[in-house]
Amino acid sequence: MTKPFRIANAPCSWGVLEFDLEGEAAGYAQVLDEIAATGYSGTELGDWGFMPTDPPALRAELDRRGLALLAAFVPVALADRAAHAAGEAVALRTARLLRDTAGQGCFIVLADNNGSVPQRTQNAGRVTAEMGLSDAGWEVFAEGANRIARAVRAQTGLRTVFHHHCAGYVETPAEVARLMALTDPEVLGLVLDTGHIMFGGGDPLALLRAHQERIWHVHFKDFDPAVAAQARAESWDYFGAIRHGIFCELGRGAVDFPAVRDALTGMGYDGWIVVEQDVLPSLGAPKESAQRNRDYLRGIGL
């Protein structure tokens, strides 16, 4: 019998995002309470300082609610070589917290500094090749990703996964493929994010087929093509698309989650599935959405 997937959620579903945005997100105690209350068994860390940064204190908060700690998102401006050293330091600090709280099974979720390049942010979901990195730019980007992943592995034993993400330099299937070709498969894997790859013009199943050996971590996020079409027509930037609900509740968009479930099962994936429904701070009803998302997954056998 196939081992059932473990299902987690993340603070970003409560508006705890890496961007400097207006609005007040919920505090960590409320977020953890509501993740547990809505039927999830794990969480990602959220921004540094959102949850306690003392390992025993963080472990106590998680244990009190029966939650596992899985990963932490670390954005770095990888296209800028001058940012690599500071990015490595942040990744190592974060990796040590993960390791000392929850052991060696956690991941650093490395990403571009999404939302920081105006052209990519303004054209999220509709970027053209001309908006991408040059060959030299790709070498710098991959150099930074390899450097950080190798340092994390060598100094903490943790593995790193790269998160393709709209409003960054790795958004489209071609950009994902380019990064994977340029990076070390021994230390850097890939997050499959079902919503971001669709927003970026791709297909989750095709991404799974293309990069099966590199997919070590999975984010379940739905995608509303009607909002994407409106974003194109009205030239919304990435944050405008988020505000209008581009990442809708699971089962209400275009992602074929039963097919993704079957593909993950077929490839022998044994990691976590993390539900993420990115919302802006103070918007939406996160607990109710989390419950509906969990109910949807139960309805498809997850």
Residue ranges and their predicted role:
Residues 1-104, 139-140, 146-147, 185, ...:
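N-terminal pre-domain/capping segments
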Residues 42-57, 77-89, 166-172, 194-202, ...:
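Acidic-and-aromatic substrate-binding clefts and catalytic sites of carbohydrate-active enzymes
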Residues 55-59, 120-123, 168-185, 200-209, ...:
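Distinct, well-ordered alpha-helical segments
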Residues 1-20, 75, 116-128, 235-244:
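N-terminal small/glycine-rich loop or linker at the start of catalytic domains
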